[in-house]
Amino acid sequence: MKIHDFKIKKQEQKKISMLTCYDYPSACIVAESNIDCVLVGDSVAMAVHGHPTTIMATIEMMELHTQAVARGLGKQFLITDLPFLGHKSSQGHTVENVKRLLQAGAQAVKIEGADKDTCQTISHLVNAGIPVMGHIGLTPQSIHQLGGYKVQGKNSEQAETLLQQAATLEQAGCFAVVIECVPQELAKTITDSLVIPTIGIGAGPGTDGQVLVWHDMLGLQTSFNPKFVKKYFRAKDHFIEALNSYVQQVQQMHFPANEHSF
């Protein structure tokens, strides 16, 4: 998938599938699938490193995981999150951070928020030839300011703000925008108001595409079960079954067998 395909898919009313990915083996699996695009999300800080929020993601962490995913990925378009405060200092510092991610293998970056400074930064990056995906609604890097993981845009004032933010991000040059945890009717209204495609997570079926976290949709963990996640596999259960089978076979001397020995 190439960057121009995002707008083409919206025009042709073909849904976009996006999935997070954080390591080389997972990327090799995704490469053999029909997934359109991959996000090396700052959710790696939680899903892989065990932190309680995405705020702990660093540019070094994002760079390392982007390199790993890029080595294994195939035809999918690769986007990497700019981590917490990665664009809140000088524009020069922001460009340097983005440069590191692109050199690591990313084809675009995703930036959360739509305040004036953020939109100016996005415009600056786009003018420099760097593709940027926006992100509105529940923005995990602002979780403390938002007061927790809550649905956004539930009243008319918040809804109008999100509509304005989406329009501003489009004007700033974003090629797509993620809409996270907003009422489905609002997400559909935002989607219909934009030329660029929207990617939803917890935003209903009316967006131009969907994104889920690898560990969530494969059932690799069971402690975090948001309403918007559908588990397509029970990987944790199968992994535990395999581990226990290995232990049993070692104890009963069924492994290694002759076929596994020299």
Swiss-Prot record:
Top EC class for this record: transferase
Pathway: Cofactor biosynthesis; (R)-pantothenate biosynthesis; (R)-pantoate from 3-methyl-2-oxobutanoate: step 1/2
Catalytic activity, as annotated: 3-methyl-2-oxobutanoate + (6R)-5,10-methylene-5,6,7,8-tetrahydrofolate + H2O = 2-dehydropantoate + (6S)-5,6,7,8-tetrahydrofolate
Entries under Pfam families matching the protein: Pantoate_transf
Record's cofactor remark: Binds 1 Mg(2+) ion per subunit.
GO biological process, one term: pantothenate biosynthetic process
Localization in the cell: Cytoplasm
Binding of Mg(2+), residues: D42, D81, E112
Gene Ontology molecular functions: 3-methyl-2-oxobutanoate hydroxymethyltransferase activity; magnesium ion binding
Entry EC no(s): 2.1.2.11
Active site, UniProt feature: E180
HAMAP family, A to Z: PanB (MF_00156)
Protein's recorded name: 3-methyl-2-oxobutanoate hydroxymethyltransferase
Organism: Legionella pneumophila subsp. pneumophila (strain Philadelphia 1 / ATCC 33152 / DSM 7513)
